[in-house]
Amino acid sequence: MNHKLPQHIAVVMDGNGRWAESRGLPRVEGHKAGLDSVKKIINCCLEKKISCLSLFAFSSENWSRPVTEVNFLMELFLEALRKEIDDLNQHGIRLKFTGDREPLSQVLQKQMYDAEALTRNNQQLILNVVVNYGGKWDIVTAAKKLIHSVLDGKLACDEINEAVFAQFLDTSGMPEPDLFIRTSGELRISNFFLWQLAYTELYFTDVHWPDFNEHEFELALTSFARRARRFGQISQSE
């Protein structure tokens, strides 16, 4: 493709459970199948030299799912990290994790820290795995940090603007997403990157995540390329 490409893509990987249930399989089989789609999309981003890919792996609301499913997801995440980290590193991928790590197991937290440390200097692609995250949590946490900076005398109230506030978000240092993709037919962002998606192009597809392949990714990119991003301004044709 010769058309313009997004540099940061954020994805809500929805429909693993529904994919499995539609095939008469346990929901956990859908989560396993979803890992294959993750690998495919990472490879697509590498081929197209996209700078950053954010994957919404587990939201703060997902704790309300059945305990057995939550435990399986955490074990699957840990296992995938251990299994794939060397390959990700060899391909020049830098791993980052966004979200509240405190409720996660110490073993998982250490694996995340080690993965970030190992890949810190890689530059081919930033793979931002979003775990135990909520957009409201991110904004509230950022506000608390900002207040402490003001009280500590490190920041004056008059210095606070949107750019300064963004530095206190958990995504600090990353560009805001150009393209948001959500699979499985849900038409909402579900408390994901509430601040960061202000001017992001939204793309929704009925395809469940395990069926989201290279062709489906191309369709999303084609849709993005056809859009005129105005950022609140008037386009040149108007």
Swiss-Prot record:
Ligand binding (substrate): 15-19, 27, 31, 59-61, 63, 65, 182, 188-190
EC number: 2.5.1.31
Amino acids binding Mg(2+): D14, E201
PROSITE patterns cross-referenced by the UniProt entry: UPP_SYNTHASE
Gene Ontology MF, one: ditrans,polycis-undecaprenyl-diphosphate synthase [(2E,6E)-farnesyl-diphosphate specific] activity
Its biological purpose: Catalyzes the sequential condensation of isopentenyl diphosphate (IPP) with (2E,6E)-farnesyl diphosphate (E,E-FPP) to yield (2Z,6Z,10Z,14Z,18Z,22Z,26Z,30Z,34E,38E)-undecaprenyl diphosphate (di-trans,octa-cis-UPP). UPP is the precursor of glycosyl carrier lipid in the biosynthesis of bacterial cell wall polysaccharide components such as peptidoglycan and lipopolysaccharide.
PANTHER family, sorted: DEHYDRODOLICHYL DIPHOSPHATE SYNTHASE 2, DEHYDRODOLICHYL DIPHOSPHATE SYNTHASE FAMILY MEMBER
Subunit structure: Homodimer.
Protein's UniProt name: Ditrans,polycis-undecaprenyl-diphosphate synthase ((2E,6E)-farnesyl-diphosphate specific)
Species lineage: Bacteria, Pseudomonadati, Pseudomonadota, Gammaproteobacteria, Legionellales
